[in-house]
């Protein structure tokens, strides 16, 4: 009888643990999608108002602009007039929100802008921004091309059809792996749809007909057009399973002893790249790029990938 009672007690305890685990998984996040995008709304309004005090910052907040640590008032700029293009992704479980935006300035110029916020306990603990103006990423510049937000970036995918958290990261990592190995015997193709569209600071580089020839994202890797590039300091700070979009932040450098295959890819860069993924394959890519020498830090710890120079 004691054994039966003991077994029953264990079963009840296990059932309790299972219910507890289920409750944790199904628990409402402290800050849901609307809440997190609300923090982004507040940030962008404070930017155009140039009023840092309106942003609910934690006392220990970490702020970077193009890899340089600074206070938020140093990361804002006086000329920001209004946001003319913006879309967001979130991770409710981890309190992350990231935005790609185009900011119209008072002088009529435009700024490409990526903002990543971490929210904990109702306060922003991390602010990471990448900001590029015309000429700061060579010829990659066409923010006027970004008007209506692509439907591929705004989906609400039903749970049964969603790629997993790590599945989204795997798709993005396949892209960097293809970039890293293209033109070599170790080349491994990326998980790209044949008609994948890529936008770099607004310039559409693939998924369109150019000079009578279709520009294919997979073909660029297949033909080794980016041989020698080193994709390092890789991070995946925001993963949105409902939207099917993952943000990766990386460094574009060169492998030791290699030269760029193209004048357009000569400079080292800090890049925020958003990947829209469907059933494990990349459908659309949006990147904010800023020229940053490999020797300069980003202020954040890498998660994966080779080191500087490809080591």
What positions do the PLM features span?
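Gram-negative bacterial Sec-dependent N-terminal signal peptides
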Residues: 2-21
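C-terminal and inter-domain tail/linker signature
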Residues: 22-311
């Amino acid at each position: 009888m004691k054994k039966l009672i003991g077994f029953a007690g264990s079963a009840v305890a296990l059932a309790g643990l299972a219910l507890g685990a289920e409750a944790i998984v199904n628990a409402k996040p402290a800050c849901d999608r609307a809440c997190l995008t609300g923090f982004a709304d507040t940030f962008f309004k404070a930017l155009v108002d140039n009023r840092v005090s309106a942003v609910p910052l934690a006392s220990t907040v970490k702020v970077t602009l193009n890899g340089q640590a600074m206070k938020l008032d140093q990361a804002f700029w006086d000329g920001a007039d209004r946001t003319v293009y913006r879309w967001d992704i979130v991770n409710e479980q981890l309190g992350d929100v990231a935005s790609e935006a185009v900011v119209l300035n008072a002088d009529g110029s435009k700024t490409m802008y990526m903002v990543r916020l971490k929210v904990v306990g109702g306060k922003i603990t991390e602010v990471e921004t990448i900001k590029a103006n015309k000429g700061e990423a060579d010829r990659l510049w066409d923010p006027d091309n970004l008007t209506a937000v692509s439907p591929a970036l705004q989906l609400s995918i039903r749970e049964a059809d969603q790629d997993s958290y790590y599945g989204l990261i795997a798709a993005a990592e396949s892209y960097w792996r293809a970039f890293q190995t293209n033109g070599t015997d170790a080349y491994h193709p990326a998980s790209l749809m044949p008609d994948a569209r890529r936008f770099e600071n607004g310039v559409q580089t693939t998924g369109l007909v150019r000079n009578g020839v279709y520009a294919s994202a997979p073909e660029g890797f297949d033909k080794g057009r980016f041989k020698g590039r080193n994709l390092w300091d890789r991070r995946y700070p925001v993963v949105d399973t409902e939207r099917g979009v993952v943000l990766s932040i990386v460094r574009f450098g060169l492998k030791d002893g290699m030269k760029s295959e193209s004048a357009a890819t000569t400079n080292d860069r800090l890049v925020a790249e958003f990947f829209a993924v469907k059933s494990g394959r990349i459908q659309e890519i949006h990147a904010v790029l800023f020229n940053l020498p490999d020797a300069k830090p980003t202020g954040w710890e890498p998660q994966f990938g080779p080191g500087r120079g490809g080591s």
